[in-house]
Amino acid sequence: MKKVALISLCIFTALSAFADSPNTATASINLEQEKQNWELAQHQDYLKRLKQREVFLQVEGLLKSAVKKQQFSEATQNITKTLIDSLQGYPLQYDLLARFWETKIAFLQNDDIQGRQQAINELNALVQQNYPFVTPAFQALLQKLSTLNEQQTSATSDNAKENNRVQKEQNQVENPKQLAEIVRKSDPNTLDKTVLIDAFPRYLKTLPEQMNNLSFESYQKWANTWQLSEDEIKQWKIAFLNRFFDNENTDFQKWRDEQIRQLQTDNLTERRLRMAIWQKTELTSWLNLLSAESKSKQEWRYWEAKQDILKNTKKLTALSKERGFYPMLAATQLKQAYQLNVPIAPSFTQAEQLPFKQVFAMITELRELGRNGLAKQRWRILLDNVDFTTQLKLSEYAKNQQWFELAVDASIVAKAWDYLSLRLPNAYSEYFNAALQNLNISKTFAMAIARQESAWNPMAQSSANARGLMQLLPSTAKLTAENNQLPYQGEQDLFKPLNNILLGTAHLNELNGKYPNNRILIAAAYNAGANRVGKWLSRASGKLALDEFVASIPFYETRGYVQNVVAYDFYYQILQNKENPQIFSQEELNRLY
């Protein structure tokens, strides 16, 4: 509607200028008529699109029914083909045509040579039209037709044996608890050692982390028996150390540190560094073990700067000029303002936009139909075939269309990390304004959480069944709704932006009651749960500064989550022109964790 209003305004402005011309005395008489004609044309286009959408859905339903009932008569084929042909100008006409041919080919008999040839001819003609995104589907159908008459031979006895062997190995991998028995009973000459290698890390997870008399010696014997290479044994040791890293046995801890020094594997060294940070022991020897690549990370440059008293200010100053959480920490350590350069994203001219008109119409219609996943697939194909500047312009276009998740996606594909207005669009602003009334949560923080959780995809769903913009679990949503007298009718409500934002911000406010004005703890609890945060605080025993606590969060995901949310909050303050933008609150900085 915003676009329609803008176009209308432009037309009326142009017509008004025309009416003011002394050489067009009759133009003012026709202005109202021109306005009515334009509005009528817009309305007729809208009605036409609604009708086409209805036909699209009806034909799609017919094709689904044909497949389900295994009936696709010639009469039904003719009806559906006629209806598809009537959809001239509809963005998804060729999608439906591909679906029609997919259904028709499924019903072709092997001996129907004439029908197969007719299909090949028509599909070849469609391929020649080179219709965006749909042509590969037609090509795939042609390939399917070319192999339709090929008879599938039964598997040979050798293949059957191979399949049985693979299935047996898969069963072994799926039951890692049995690995010790498999090693004891199996002959190294008959069982592929990759089965053993792949299953070992999962076998370790079946063992208690704090088991007594912990030793790698027995697994070294396995490795010798199965003639594992040095690199394979190294991978086993890494898996073993990762599994039992926090085992409290002092002999194991001594062996662990020796192995970390020998293996010099960054993920283990970084984990040992985090342990040293929360234990408040020396860091330099562990920092020196890092590879050049890891040493270049902002996080370890920050900690190296804190250890180097002589060059502390110089290193922190250099870091503070970059973008990110640790540059913000560096500026805070230096008690300096954090300066941020935000480039302006380019936009399409009308002429530049024309080549994408068909694609934009397709994506618009898919989104209208709720096919956001397919719309994103086509958006990604588009992004992968244009240059960096065009990717930026596409991101800006998507943002202006309120395709917020596609704008973010384009910024990620382009690696446009400095273009914060594209990475962090001002999405669902009115909903946040409404939801945050009378809550002790800032708009920029709530939006930072949503951006980190879903990248502004309202249909996002995690493997744990967290849903929507702020990725709420149905159980959390239900409890939050009850505690705050908010409407909630079930899981599907979480895919509705307003409902999700109401519940997500209410949950943030509940966490704020537990951790007043401390986004570090609120964000960590929102991601990992308040119980885990409680355990981490208990382990820290009120001895850690803000930077030490964040660095020692044991979960990789939560650690990155907290850092991103704090950074996004500050970026949103800049983008929303907040006065005196604040990186950290006094409560966050002054607290010992």
Swiss-Prot record:
Q: Does the keyword Nucleus apply?
A: no
Q: Which residues form the signal peptide?
A: 1-19
EC number(s) from the headed UniProt entry: 4.2.2.n1
Please note every region of biased composition (Basic and acidic residues): 159-168
Pfam family example for this protein?
SLT
Q: Where in the cell is it found?
A: Periplasm
Concerning SUPFAM superfamilies, the annotation shows:
Bacterial muramidases, Lysozyme-like
| Example GO BP | cell wall organization
Q: Where is this region: Slt-type domain?
A: 440-529
Which UniProt keywords are present, listed alphabetically? Cell wall biogenesis/degradation, Lyase, Periplasm, Signal
Chief location of this protein?
periplasm
| Family label | Belongs to the transglycosylase Slt family.
What job does this protein perform? Murein-degrading enzyme. May play a role in recycling of muropeptides during cell elongation and/or cell division.
Q: Write down what this protein is called.
A: Putative soluble lytic murein transglycosylase
State the organism of origin: Haemophilus influenzae (strain ATCC 51907 / DSM 11121 / KW20 / Rd)
